[in-house]
From Swiss-Prot:
A double ring-shaped homohexamer of HslV is capped on each side by a ring-shaped HslU homohexamer. The assembly of the HslU/HslV complex is dependent on binding of ATP. The keyword Hydrolase does not apply. ATPase subunit of a proteasome-like degradation complex; this subunit has chaperone activity. The binding of ATP and its subsequent hydrolysis by HslU are essential for unfolding of protein substrates subsequently hydrolyzed by HslV. HslU recognizes the N-terminal part of its protein substrates and unfolds these before they are guided to HslV for hydrolysis. ATP binds at V20, G62, V63, G64, K65, T66, E67, D280, E345, R417. HAMAP family: HslU (MF_00249). This is ATP-dependent protease ATPase subunit HslU. It comes from the Bacteria. Belongs to the ClpX chaperone family. HslU subfamily.
Length: 467
């Protein structure tokens, strides 16, 4: 729970490492997150009455709406899911129902809890995995196996995963084999055998049937688990490096140690208390955006979303989940509509409104250079793998920023995503030729940027198709 104990200023500081500007939005999400921590410090009867203040982010595409929510979830290691409001259909029509967003959130929570539980038992699982691996690398002497002689009971026992126990009983281990196994175990623990190939037997991954499962999952029934319990676990052989084999076996042994029921109950609790659901393109399901359209009205989708945002119980295959304390963050450009076009009940469930600013040329300069793993740092690192060093001059970066701003202004405004298309166009030849170039240093100057991009920028029709 320590990750929740961050002050709003600390949260904003961490968001600043990845997102340029948008201080009002960062401040609002930081306060919403801190309020969760504050609620958990209160008495239990008061906790139940304090619900999250959901946010509505308003701003054009590419200004950081999704990234703010995604980074926020990573900062506190909270279950997070992003959905598009336009993907849902109201009850009675073919398509995804709105409750699927909650089920997706639980799946994400399962992954988080599973990772935490597996790391807790890692040392124990590694020890068991190494023991299995040593037996594969230094096999025992096989005894002569007695024929089953048509004994149906023995054959049935073999089907139900008894073959492993029989194999161990039919192996003879001499003193030399024990000595070799001790030696191999020492080498294994030191990582000296990591690149050696080995053939291991592991359980076959579960096959899922999503198309059949959706309806049953709404009733809290997991068809895959039901069918899996009826059929025996199959083993498959895989030839991998010792390092990869170790990872596969550790995962398998961890699953045996950890109790699935504990993972499921903890994941439900985590999703209920810390889950974040980001609903994108909520402006596309307003009545205003549906005018003169032949599509089914999306107002029904708004009414289906309403009880989930208000707080209701959703059945998942891991158990029922209450949505009362899940934080919902909705976003939309609202070019053709406005927030007041949402149904009044839904408007009231998003009391905090944050308008994100359009990006300026100065913002683009910052985006290219300041964040952790900024775009220019990414391209320099990629080309650096070919032993070619690339340096961007300050003037070149400023010119790139102004080009991105001008193209956004004169064509469609896609925000920071414009920088991706411009950099790809600028570095296209270099990315193609780099493997055949000798080691050296290349400086990207303002003149080089103009040479590569000016003709396209000046021709508005070309800009629309290429940039």
């Amino acid at each position: 729970m320590n990750e929740l104990n961050k002050t709003p200023k600390e949260i904003v500081k961490e968001l600043d490492q990845y997102i340029v500007g948008q201080q009002a939005a960062k401040k609002s999400v930081a306060v919403a997150l801190r309020n969760r921590y504050r609620r958990l410090q209160l008495e239990e009867n008061m906790q139940q009455d304090i619900t999250p203040k959901n946010l509505l982010m308003i701003g054009p595409t590419g200004v950081g709406k999704t990234e703010i929510a995604r980074r926020l979830a990573k900062i506190v290691n909270a279950p997070f899911v992003k959905v598009e409001a336009t993907k849902f259909t109201e009850v009675g029509y073919v398509g995804r129902d709105v409750e699927s967003m909650v089920r997706d959130l639980v799946e994400n929570a399962i992954q988080i809890v599973e990772k935490q539980q597996y790391s807790r038992v890692y040392a124990q699982a590694l020890k068991k995995a190494n023991q299995r691996l040593v037996k594969v690398l230094v096999p025992g002497i096989k005894k002569e196996q007695k024929q089953a002689g048509g004994n149906q009971f023995e054959q049935m026992m073999n089907m139900f995963n008894m073959a492993q126990q029989q194999q161990e009983a039919q192996e003879e281990v001499t003193e030399d084999i024990r000595t070799n196994r001790r030696t191999i175990l020492e080498q294994l623990e030191k990582g000296l055998l990591d690149n050696r190939e080995v053939t291991i037997e592991i359980e076959e991954p579960k096959k899922t049937m999503p198309a059949m499962n959706n309806g049953l999952e709404q009733m809290g029934i997991d068809l895959n688990e039901t069918l899996g319990a009826l059929s025996p676990k199959k083993k498959i052989e895989r030839t991998v490096t010792v390092k990869e084999a170790q990872e596969l076996l550790v995962k398998e042994e961890s699953a045996k140690i950890v109790n699935d029921a504990d993972i499921h109950s903890e994941a439900i609790r985590l999703a209920e208390s810390s889950g974040i659901i980001f609903i994108d393109e909520i402006d596309k399901i307003t009545s205003k955006s549906q005018q003169n359209s032949g599509e089914v009205s999306r107002e029904g989708v708004q009414r289906d979303i309403l009880p989930i945002v208000e707080g209701s119980q959703v059945n998942t295959k891991y158990g029922p989940l209450q949505t009362d304390h899940i934080l919902f963050i909705a976003s939309g450009a609202f070019h053709l509509s406005k927030p007041s076009d949402l149904i009044p009940e839904l408007q009231g469930r998003f009391p905090i409104r944050v308008e994100l600013d359009d990006l300026t040329a100065d913002d683009f300069v910052s985006i290219l250079t300041e964040p952790n793993n900024a775009l220019i740092k990414q391209y320099v690192a990629l080309i650096g793998t070919e032993n070619v060093s690339v340096i961007f001059t300050k003037e070149a970066i400023e010119r790139l920023a102004h080009i991105a701003y001008d193209v956004n202004r004169d064509t469609d405004n896609i925000g920071a995503r414009r920088l991706h298309t411009i950099l790809e166009r600028l570095l296209e030849d270099l990315l193609y030729e780099a493997p055949d170039m000798q080691m050296g240093e290349i400086t990207i100057t303002e003149a080089y940027v103009n040479e590569k991009l000016n003709d396209i920028v000046q021709n508005e029709d070309l800009s629309r198709y290429i940039l």
